[in-house]
């Protein structure tokens, strides 16, 4: 076991040991790589869900009552959902959510591991981890349409001088739509590595050539990135039925003054 994995496990063991002794804690769930320890490396954070009795949520939300080694914290902050994030002086990251068992039913989950369960936690986690996540429910025809839309949308923002907004549209929205279309169309090299909730996670292992192409494209200026992404979509998905619609690609190119695809 690597030093990173040992340190990761020891920190989690300490937190769980502390939390499981508290009468208002119903359960503790490890999420993401905190659950799937095979993925742990030096960059892995800790992501935990703390399930509590009704009325105890605020006692755990800011982390002040349970985060270990508080003297080493650089910051801890509460987010809109009542959980929070913290960072230690060595760069160790922690994020957490807090809910009652009933409140947990409104969550979404992918990889998880129930560590403490004093009633109902495992059942609810099984339910929410199998629930469809509409934002990642791939539909190739829809997703390619969104991809083409975002190319024009993003380049338009760029030509207005809104470079930050444009960059987000092209590098996040357009790329996300393209990857969703790919997932609906092209078998992954290793489907098990893909994340159900975040379509950008571990694409490099599932579609290595495509991921490398997209990374190179996104390193360019916004408009060059957008134009490269259109070429990448056509190269990987094809132009015409079942791929990038020819009339849609032509309309994008004509509107933006690019060479015909």
What are these regions (language model features)?
Residues 1-17, 21-23, 34-43, 49-97, ...:
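Metal-dependent nucleotidyltransferase catalytic core
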Residues 18-20, 28, 174:
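Hydrophobic C-terminal alpha-helix "anchor/cap" residues
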Residues 40-43, 108-109, 196:
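Short aromatic-enriched loop/helix-cap "lid" or pocket-rim segments at secondary-structure transitions
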Residues 87-124:
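Acidic, glycine- and histidine-enriched catalytic cores of nucleic acid- and nucleotide-handling enzymes
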Residues 112-142:
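A short, charged helix-loop
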Residues 132-261:
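Conserved nucleotidyltransferase catalytic core and NTase-mimicking acidic/glycine-rich helix/loop elements
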């Amino acid at each position: 076991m690597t030093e990173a994995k040992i340190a990761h496990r020891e920190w989690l063991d300490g937190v769980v040991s502390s939390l499981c002794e508290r009468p208002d804690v119903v359960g503790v769930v490890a999420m993401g790589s905190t659950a799937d320890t095979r993925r742990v490396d030096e960059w892995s954070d800790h992501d935990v869900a703390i399930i509590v009795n009704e009325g105890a949520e605020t006692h755990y939300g800011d982390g002040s009552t349970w985060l270990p080694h508080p003297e080493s914290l650089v910051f801890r902050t509460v987010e809109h959902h009542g959980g929070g994030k913290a960072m230690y002086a060595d760069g160790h990251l922690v994020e957490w959510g807090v809910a009652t068992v009933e409140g947990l039913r409104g969550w979404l989950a992918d990889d998880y591991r129930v560590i403490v369960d004093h009633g109902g936690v495992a059942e609810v986690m099984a339910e929410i981890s199998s629930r469809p996540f509409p934002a990642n429910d791939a539909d190739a025809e829809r997703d390619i349409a969104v991809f083409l839309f975002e190319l024009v949308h993003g380049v338009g923002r760029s030509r207005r001088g809104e470079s930050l907004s444009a960059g987000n549209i092209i590098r996040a929205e357009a790329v996300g739509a393209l990857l969703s279309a790919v997932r609906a169309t092209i078998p992954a090299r290793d489907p098990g590595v893909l994340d159900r909730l975040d379509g950008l996670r571990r694409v490099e292992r599932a579609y290595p050539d495509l991921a490398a192409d997209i990374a190179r494209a996104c390193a360019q200026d916004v408009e060059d990135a957008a134009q490269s992404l259109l070429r990448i979509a056509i190269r990987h998905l094809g132009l015409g039925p079942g791929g990038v619609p020819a009339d849609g690609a032509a309309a994008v190119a004509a509107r933006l003054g690019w060479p015909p695809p």
